Amino acid sequence: MTLAASTPPSADGRDERPAGLAPLPEPDAIRFAVVDVETTGLDPAMTRVLESAVVELAADGHPLGEWTSLVSVPGEGELGASWLHGITRSMLSPAPPFRELAGELTAHLAGRVIVGHVLDFDLSHLAAEYARCGLVLPDLRRVGICTRELARSSLPPGPRSLVACCKALGVSCPAAHTALGDARATAAVFAAFLRMGVVPDPRAAAARAAALAWPMSAWDPLGPSCAVPRGSVGRGA
């Protein structure tokens, strides 16, 4: 893996990181969590997460695993741009509410460097959902990397949508506007940027991620998952 240096060592080899930061991890030990959410709208204070996904990557961008679930929301109202995200009320009927997924989602995010395309959008909606459960999501912007921002500095001028970035990098994007499809596409875009050597050295972000205080979770990683992936339900009306 080739990384762009962010905090070079001093002339005598000492690590000139800010005081108090945890020791930097070995590069090969870094793990990335690529996140995406589909929502009922744009304002996290007013709208809800309908689907969430995480793709875990190794330090070199190789996929290690993935997780996704639909999320039930209260009421019988509209679900936003259903024509775009394809989620219907009947699809959500077997899905758990966010409070039942929060522990499982936390287990897939904690300790990782968080990656997303327009990352602030995903993080703001997740923070709002955690808050509705009485939980505080740590400030993941401090341990996050936005692929749209990388595209702005690393690709020729042009659109910076996820689909446009995939096209510019020769990456497949077969399931756009599904949480898992977009997370997979973002992961592939990020892996391409890793190979290009344009990703700022993530070791400091990884050290901060390891030190974050996450909500306590009662979810047992050896127990059954309560996630309901999109592919396990019919679309219905």
Question: How would you label these PLM feature ranges?
Answer:
Residues 1-2, 182:
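Short, intrinsically disordered, low-complexity terminal segments
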Residues 2-24, 188-237:
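Acidic two-metal-ion nuclease catalytic site recognized across multiple nuclease folds
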Residues 2-141, 156-176:
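Conserved non-catalytic scaffold segment of RNase H-like nuclease domains
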Residues 35-37, 145, 181:
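Active-site flanking residues adjacent to catalytic metal/cofactor-binding acidic residues
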Residues 100, 148, 183-184:
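Short secondary-structure boundary/hinge segments and terminal tails
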Residues 126, 150, 186-190:
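Buried hydrophobic packing segments
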Residues 144-156:
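Short, flexible loop segments at boundaries between secondary-structure elements
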Residues 178-192:
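Acidic, divalent-metal-coordinating active-site segment for phosphoryl/phosphodiester hydrolysis
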